[in-house]
Swiss-Prot record:
Transmembrane segments: none annotated. GO terms for molecular function: oxidoreductase activity. It comes from Eggerthella lenta (strain ATCC 25559 / DSM 2243 / CCUG 17323 / JCM 9979 / KCTC 3265 / NCTC 11813 / VPI 0255 / 1899 B) (Eubacterium lentum). The lineage of its organism: Bacteria, Bacillati, Actinomycetota, Coriobacteriia, Eggerthellales. Belongs to the short-chain dehydrogenases/reductases (SDR) family. This is 3beta-hydroxysteroid dehydrogenase 1. The active site is at residue 158. NAD(+) binds at residues 65-66, 92, 158, 162.
Length: 261
């Protein structure tokens, strides 16, 4: 637990399920005011809010499509209305669509980039403007992926968007470090989330994934939530411009683990 987080306000985009819901719940457990954003899964976001409130925290569910700048502005305004300010902004919302690159439509490509990269920039931009206007320190956490550095066939748009998130994070961190604004990213590996539920229900598919992970098992959303809480806290006050890989070692070239390769 991080005492310095208590009473602060955090916005978490894409909080209906998976990593976003886990981070929102962890922030609530830290005593924070949580704005749980969703695009279409209202019930999921309200379940996140209920869990936070039942644990004694304060939270609000707010609809917004982060690929649209005006919706990001409205999300910020809702956070201001609900809790009077924003201290931490977490850009978690993201999508992925599998298709061979030679058959991937420009519209499909653009949709992924709009949500995963442009939406992240829009959130960063709005949060930074608020921090500067109030002359206050602030924290931004962007959700990247191991595919920030690992190529992913059939997901060229997703991999490109996450590589972009990594460099955007570094650039903004450098640009605003002297203003007390910290910008970091978290890059999850294989996680037990709803988006992976069907795949991991197949024992062979799960085992194949686990062979790519030096630690030998798939991670939990709570692993990412723990990383987010630390990055948001004063314990990470000297950390900015980094991507924290929460991946069980997946990015460590696992084929070389036992002298192979």
């Amino acid at each position: 637990m991080y005492d310095d987080l208590k009473g602060k306000t955090v916005v978490v985009t894409g909080s209906s399920k998976g990593l976003g819901a886990a981070m929102a719940r962890r922030f609530g457990a830290e005593g924070m005011n949580v704005v749980a954003n969703y695009r279409s899964d209202e019930e999921g976001a309200r379940e996140t809010v209920r869990a936070i409130e039942e644990a004694g925290g304060a939270a609000a569910a707010v609809q917004a499509d982060v690929s649209k700048n005006e919706c990001v502005d409205a999300l910020f305004d809702a956070a201001m209305f609900s809790f009077g300010g924003v201290d931490i902004w977490v850009n978690n919302a993201g999508i992925e669509v599998a298709s061979p690159s030679d058959r991937k439509s420009i519209e499909e490509w653009q949709r992924v980039i709009d949500v995963n990269l442009t939406g992240v920039f829009a959130g960063c931009r709005r949060a930074i403007d608020h921090f500067l206007d109030r002359k206050m320190p602030g924290v931004i956490i962007n959700l990247s992926s191991v595919h920030e550095i690992i190529p992913w066939p059939h997901f060229a748009d997703y991999a490109a968007s996450k590589a972009g998130v990594g460099m955007l994070t570094k650039t903004l961190a450098l640009e605003y470090a002297d203003r007390g604004i910290r910008v970091n990213a978290i890059a999850p590996g294989a996680m037990n989330t709803p988006i992976n539920a069907e795949k991991f229900a197949d024992p062979e598919a799960r085992a194949a994934t686990e062979r790519l992970i030096p630690m030998g098992y798939v991670g939990a959303p709570e692993d990412v939530a723990a990383a987010a809480a630390w990055l948001a806290s004063d314990q990470a006050s000297y950390v900015t411009g980094t991507t924290l890989f929460v991946d069980g070692g997946m990015t460590l070239y696992p084929g070389f683990q036992f002298g192979q390769g």
